[in-house]
Amino acid sequence: MSLLTEVETYVLSIVPSGPLKAEIAQRLEDVFAGKNTDLEALMEWLKTRPILSPLTKGILGFVFTLTVPSERGLQRRRFVQNALNGNGDPNNMDRAVKLYKKLKREITFHGAKEVALSYSTGALASCMGLIYNRMGTVTTEVALGLVCATCEQIADSQHRSHRQMATATNPLIRHENRMVLASTTAKAMEQMAGSSEQAAEAMEVASQTRQMVQAMRTIGTHPSSSAGLKDNLLENLQAYQKRMGVQMQRFK
């Protein structure tokens, strides 16, 4: 795996799924391929994106700044600085300075990532802030290693939270989760559907599902009433994919 592929993988792992994720992936690909060289416009676009947490925006802004060639005196952006200040906690700043000194001695991406992984997310963000604000300089490879370590920590905590959701025993949470997943799968079916006969069938199933979920939410239903909702939908989606000759593992 090339360095930039690895960076893209880690960064995208902390972006919530949806159309915006696809858009960010495209921007990252363009930047890494040297196709997008207008850092100012890129940062303005990033700043106004909805859904993303300030820290995710800060990390993306940091990556764009590292990889897009720009004039030396280009202004640093406040939204990135605020996100990478370690919540203003002086402990984070102290640890960030210690980490920075260690990173100065590193020359490889993987070496930097290994060193950084033993620090907290707050300290890692503060360290990125130091580099972003030009208070310290490290090689681009080392800075990207720091980025990936931060993303790995964030993705780990998100994964734990998703796992807790998947194993939640509260029937109301499970009920709502099934309806959300059914709705999302229905949306995916609608996006995949082209204009063939089978597509019309898939659209019909998806539309009915979404109406059903809407009705269940409006009138309030028993937690067990959603059992099987997502599974039925997934079976329909997989049958439709087979007929269309499409294999999309990610919906399983």
Swiss-Prot record:
* Superkingdom of the source species: Viruses
Sorted alphabetically, the Gene Ontology cellular component annotations on this record are: host cell nucleus; membrane; virion membrane
Q: Where is this region: RNP-binding?
A: 165-252
Q: Does the keyword Kinase apply?
A: no
> Mostly located where?
virion
- What's a GO biological-process term for it? viral budding from plasma membrane
Motif Nuclear localization signal covers 101-105
Q: Where is the stretch described as Membrane-binding?
A: 1-164
Q: Does the keyword Membrane apply?
A: yes
**Mode of membrane association:** Peripheral membrane protein
Record keywords, A-Z? Host nucleus, Membrane, RNA-binding, Viral matrix protein, Virion
A Gene Ontology MF term for this entry? RNA binding
Query: Which InterPro entries does the protein's record reference?
Result: Flu_matrix_M1, Flu_matrix_M1_C, Flu_matrix_M1_N, Flu_matrix_M1_N_sub1, Flu_matrix_M1_N_sub2, INFV_M1
Protein purpose = Plays critical roles in virus replication, from virus entry and uncoating to assembly and budding of the virus particle. M1 binding to ribonucleocapsids (RNPs) in nucleus seems to inhibit viral transcription. Interaction of viral NEP with M1-RNP is thought to promote nuclear export of the complex, which is targeted to the virion assembly site at the apical plasma membrane in polarized epithelial cells. Interactions with NA and HA may bring M1, a non-raft-associated protein, into lipid rafts. Forms a continuous shell on the inner side of the lipid bilayer in virion, where it binds the RNP. Determines the virion's shape: spherical or filamentous. Clinical isolates of influenza are characterized by the presence of significant proportion of filamentous virions, whereas after multiple passage on eggs or cell culture, virions have only spherical morphology. Filamentous virions are thought to be important to infect neighboring cells, and spherical virions more suited to spread through aerosol between hosts organisms.
* More info: Most abundant protein in virion. When expressed alone can form virus-like particles in transfected cells.
By what name is this protein known? Matrix protein 1
Task: Write the gene name.
Answer: M
